[in-house]
């Protein structure tokens, strides 16, 4: 068998159905759209329109809001910090902060700061400067001989 001898399986391909090409084609005139009405016209798709029935987005109640002042922290686990130290991407002797975590590829962007959570174990003795840390995370870092410095949140604009 050669590349030029390869053929599709029988019945696997279908020729395109050409619509609106005369009465003899079998799909001329209305081209499979039926007679009159909204769906026979061009540009029919009206997003969210359910034919006059109250649409789902109006049947369901409005809930909640997006707080524009909410702090958006990047969450980092102790396990990921330890993995970066083990891989040689983070220097345990240097101060670990948002810039160091970004340079090591642990986080992509700092947003409003970094929050450390206690998921996993930490063996390295590190000095970490972050915007937030959970109490168990602080305990684990201090148990390993490290220190945690929490940055004060920026004052809200008045």
Curated annotation (Swiss-Prot):
Residues 1-44 are annotated as: Disordered. Pfam families: Ribosomal_L27A. GO terms for cellular component: cytosolic large ribosomal subunit. PROSITE patterns: RIBOSOMAL_L15 (PS00475). Keywords: Ribonucleoprotein, Ribosomal protein, RNA-binding, rRNA-binding. InterPro entries: Ribosomal_uL15, Ribosomal_uL15/eL18, Ribosomal_uL15/eL18_sf, Ribosomal_uL15_bac-type, Ribosomal_uL15_CS. GO terms for molecular function: rRNA binding; structural constituent of ribosome. One of its GO terms (biological process) is translation. Residues 21-35 have a biased composition (Gly residues). Residues 1-13 have a biased composition (Basic and acidic residues). The keyword Lipid biosynthesis does not apply. Belongs to the universal ribosomal protein uL15 family. Binds to the 23S rRNA. Part of the 50S ribosomal subunit. This is Large ribosomal subunit protein uL15. It comes from Rhizobium etli (strain ATCC 51251 / DSM 11541 / JCM 21823 / NBRC 15573 / CFN 42). The gene is rplO.
């Amino acid at each position: 068998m050669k590349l030029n001898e390869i053929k599709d399986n029988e019945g696997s391909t279908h020729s395109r159905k050409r619509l609106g090409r005369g009465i003899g084609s079998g799909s001329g005139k209305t081209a499979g759209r039926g007679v009159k009405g909204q769906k026979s016209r061009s540009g029919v798709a009206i997003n969210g329109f359910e034919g006059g029935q109250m649409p789902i987005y109006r049947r369901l109640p409005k809930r909640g809001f997006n707080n524009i002042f909410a702090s958006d922290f990047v969450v980092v686990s102790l396990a990921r910090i330890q993995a970066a130290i083990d891989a040689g991407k983070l220097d345990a002797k240097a101060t670990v902060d948002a810039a160091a975590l970004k340079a090591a590829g642990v986080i992509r962007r700092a947003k409003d700061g970094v929050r450390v959570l206690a998921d996993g174990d930490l063996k390295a003795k590190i000095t970490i400067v972050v915007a937030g840390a959970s109490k168990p995370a602080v305990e684990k870092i201090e148990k390993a001989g490290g220190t945690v410095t929490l940055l004060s949140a920026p004052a809200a604009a008045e």
